[in-house]
């Protein structure tokens, strides 16, 4: 489906170059303007004001106005339960090319929230209740030409694109679920671009003149939950296990250096002081042994476990 408010399909629309947001993250994880040229927050931190870029048109030729953005946001909040998990507006007001979003409590990261593909801007004037294989009208460099769920999507150049003439006239996106199969398809020349490959596939393409490898720092954190029942109901055992886990070695050896040891739910790519955080359960095998000893656990056979 191409319904942007359903599950995470808005990511597909954005990745295909069709959808755009008011703001976006650059390759270094820093926020930058997109459909909004600039923004500021009120003194009481409750109202964010966005200046909508002049001269932008939807792919159908309709102008992008603050009123159009407001209507798109209202549709998103109406149809998506996830939207209020980012922030809950008490009002959205459009005036010319200025959009004001007010919340009951300060939301310091509201602009960052609007970079999520869920908040991509669509033209609601077509009054479509639900997009399935028919595509929403957006402002990106490409428009949907054909879409067959789980098989492929074809996009063509948006002649009304505000950011200059897109480089390719047409692009076909194939749905290849298996990462290894994607890598083989790229290697054979069946496809020209592949993303989200396994780290072990990287070595297959390194050093090849006709292959361009691009890497970006992720905005995601991966979290492993511990079972807090049974044997692991003892918090001392859980803490010892954490301190016995060499996350740095795991990231370097098993993930080929493509990950950073975590110490908080928020990754270092987001500006929340990750580098200043202290990991209370960093790798410390001696501390792990001490915790186990105090809790009454003994290494009866001397194998270190």
Which sequence ranges carry the predicted segments?
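N-terminal lobe/hinge region of extracytoplasmic solute-binding protein
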Residues: 1-43, 74, 137-138
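Gly/Pro-rich hinge or "lid" segments in bacterial periplasmic/extracellular proteins
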Residues: 26-30, 115-166, 170, 178-180, ...
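Aromatic- and charge-enriched surface segment that lines or borders ligand/interaction sites
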Residues: 37-79, 100, 232
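Surface-exposed binding/hinge segments that line
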Residues: 40, 44, 51, 84-125, ...
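Second-shell loop/turn segments in exported
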Residues: 52-60, 89, 172, 227-231, ...
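Extracellular/periplasmic solute-recognition and catalytic clefts
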Residues: 91-93, 145-154, 172-229, 236-240, ...
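Detector for C-terminal structural segments
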Residues: 148, 244-275
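Structural transition elements
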Residues: 261-301
């Amino acid at each position: 489906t191409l319904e942007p408010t359903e599950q995470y399909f808005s990511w597909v629309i954005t990745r295909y170059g069709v959808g755009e947001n008011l703001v976006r993250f650059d390759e270094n994880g820093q926020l930058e303007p997109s459909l909004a040229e600039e923004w500021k927050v009120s003194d009481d931190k409750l109202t964010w004001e966005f200046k909508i870029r002049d001269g932008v048109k939807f792919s159908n030729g309709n102008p992008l106005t603050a009123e159009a953005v407001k209507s798109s946001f209202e549709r998103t909040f109406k149809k998506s339960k996830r939207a209020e998990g980012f922030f809950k507006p008490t009002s959205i007001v459009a005036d010319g090319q200025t959009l004001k979003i007010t919340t009951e409590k300060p939301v310091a990261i509201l602009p960052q929230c609007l970079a999520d593909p869920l908040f991509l801007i669509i033209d609601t004037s077509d009054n479509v209740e639900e997009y399935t294989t028919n595509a929403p009208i957006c402002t990106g460099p490409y428009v949907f030409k054909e879409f067959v769920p789980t098989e492929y999507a074809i996009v063509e150049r948006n002649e009304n694109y505000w950011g200059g003439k897109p480089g390719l006239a047409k692009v076909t996106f194939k749905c290849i679920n298996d990462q290894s199969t994607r890598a083989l398809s790229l290697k054979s020349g069946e496809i020209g671009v592949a993303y989200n490959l396994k780290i072990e596939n990287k070595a297959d393409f390194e050093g090849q003149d006709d292959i361009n490898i691009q890497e970006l720092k992720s905005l995601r954190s991966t979290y492993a939950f511990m079972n807090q029942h049974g044997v692991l109901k003892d918090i001392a055992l859980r803490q010892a296990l954490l301190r016995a886990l060499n996350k740095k070695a795991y990231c370097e050896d098993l993930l080929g250096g493509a990950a950073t040891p975590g110490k908080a739910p928020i990754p270092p790519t987001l500006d929340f002081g990750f580098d200043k955080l202290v990991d209370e359960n960093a790798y410390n095998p001696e501390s792990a042994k001490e915790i186990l000893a105090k809790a009454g656990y003994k290494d009866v056979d001397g194998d270190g476990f």
